[in-house]
């Protein structure tokens, strides 16, 4: 039986995945730089996204991006991991994800959830056990000092509504970093158009 991709991760899996992954750390997100005041963050709740660079997305969004971001603790689905490129991976991701990215010729840049004790850069992607790749991408955009983030296809509705508590943390951290967040649909943030952004 296949797992629901938005299932909670257990504390045991967090420990197991992070212990395996930390042995394979090469580069971290501190080895990346995006010198842009604006970053577009895309999710799979929409099929069409504006052409803009830099653009961050989860692999499941199935678009070309400057940075693919995932916190997924399930084995990699072959239909989602099809592109080489730069990937920001949470320490809690399933260890087979990094293997798949290397097979594709991609580059991996690691980060850690805020609640694990280690020397990796910390990114908030939600609350313990309920983390979301879209929220991680928003946090990363703010981490890279974007002054303005535009969301496309990130809604956190339906089965994803359980990530709304984590959204509060991510948005609070972005505000502390003086990052403004806008949305094309107005679901999670102030609505704007791509041209007005």
Predicted feature locations:
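Metal-ion/cofactor- or nucleotide/acyl-coenzyme-handling active-site neighborhoods
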Residues: 1-197
């Amino acid at each position: 039986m296949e797992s629901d991709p938005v299932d909670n991760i257990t504390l045991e899996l967090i420990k197991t995945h992070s212990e395996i992954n930390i042995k394979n750390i090469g580069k971290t997100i501190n080895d990346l730089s995006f010198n842009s005041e604006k970053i577009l963050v895309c999710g799979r709740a929409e099929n069409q996204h504006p052409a803009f660079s830099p653009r961050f997305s989860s692999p499941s969004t199935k678009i070309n991006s400057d940075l693919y971001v995932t916190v997924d603790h399930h084995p990699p689905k072959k239909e989602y991991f099809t592109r080489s490129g730069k990937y920001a991976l949470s320490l809690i991701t399933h260890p087979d994800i990094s293997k798949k990215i290397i097979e594709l010729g991609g580059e991996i840049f690691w980060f850690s959830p805020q609640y694990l004790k280690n020397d990796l850069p910390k990114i908030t992607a939600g609350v313990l056990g309920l983390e979301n790749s879209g929220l991680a991408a928003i946090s990363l955009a703010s981490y890279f000092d974007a002054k303005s983030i535009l969301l496309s296809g990130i809604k956190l509705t339906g089965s994803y509504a359980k990530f709304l508590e984590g959204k509060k943390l991510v948005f609070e951290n972005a505000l502390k970093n003086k990052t403004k967040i806008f949305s094309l649909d107005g679901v999670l943030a102030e609505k704007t158009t791509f041209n007005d952004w």
